[in-house]
């Protein structure tokens, strides 16, 4: 079951949006700066795995500079984090598309 949710990182002043896979790991992640609503991350596990398996460190570095770094590890306990709430698939897709456009990539 795919779960989509958001939390708030008080230290970084970021809204974090996750689409978690069946194992509870981030499949896609969007980070939006709270102060100005600017997207700063829009990373995808499938893209990261593809680069890891078929490209070099330079390509991976370029991806991370453009789209940010995907969270590693299970996202257990997100429900107790600040600002935690489930988000709809539609809301996540809207945020994903907006973030990818802002960061210069395909939706």
Locate each region found by the language model.
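Short linear motifs at secondary-structure transitions and domain/linker junctions
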Residues: 3-8, 60-62, 83
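Acidic, aromatic-enriched beta-alpha/helix-loop junctions
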Residues: 25-71
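Short, compact, well-ordered microdomains
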Residues: 67-107
